[in-house]
Amino acid sequence: MTPQTRRERERAERHRLIIDTARELAESQGWDAVTVRRLAERIEYSQPVLYSHFAGKDEIVTAVAEEGIAEMAAWSRAALESAGGEPRAALAAVARSYLDFATARPALYDAMFLMKVNLAFGENASQPLRDAFAVMFAAFSPFAGEHDPETFTEVGWSALHGLATLDRGGRLRPTQRDARLAVLIDQLTR
């Protein structure tokens, strides 16, 4: 192994450590607790070392968000495939997996959709974002009818995001989660 190869490997390992530590800290104490100083202390490197990987907290959150989107896409894809090709069942499974993901990974969900990140959506989207949208599109588009399928998917995804955000914020009755999801699926599949 050449010294350059070793340095590249060590740099990649540090990069991974920064992201993993940010996720762990956010999940245990919230995103306000994630600072470059605290991350440097946790991983036992100086702040300049962290800044050699990321320009600041926003870039770290962006890296975490992109990973989260890839994870959410995998959850949603598994749900879609479990539905056996029946469109309504597929939509219901994807919708439930989305809400479950938001509940199971709150800090990750916040990084993905509620915090300031530098992720391009639309035509310039990264592959994880495209993959996530593709799963949503596969679930929602069969019900678009006369509407543009991509726009219909965006509206459906927005509705799920609203339910997830309000539910996680304690602004909806916890006992009615399944009923709300059933209403949404009924409305979208008319």
Task: Give the location of each predicted region.
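N-terminal intrinsically disordered/low-complexity leader segments
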Residues: 1-13
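Generic hydrophobic, amphipathic alpha-helix propensity
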Residues: 11-22, 39, 64-68, 72, ...
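Short, structured helix-loop boundary elements
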Residues: 15, 36, 58, 62, ...
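Helix-turn-helix
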Residues: 17, 25-59, 63
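Hydrophobic alpha-helical connector segments
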Residues: 63, 77-107, 129-132, 156
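Amphipathic alpha-helical segments used for helix-helix packing
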Residues: 101-120, 165-171
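Amphipathic C-terminal alpha-helical segment
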Residues: 157-175, 189-190
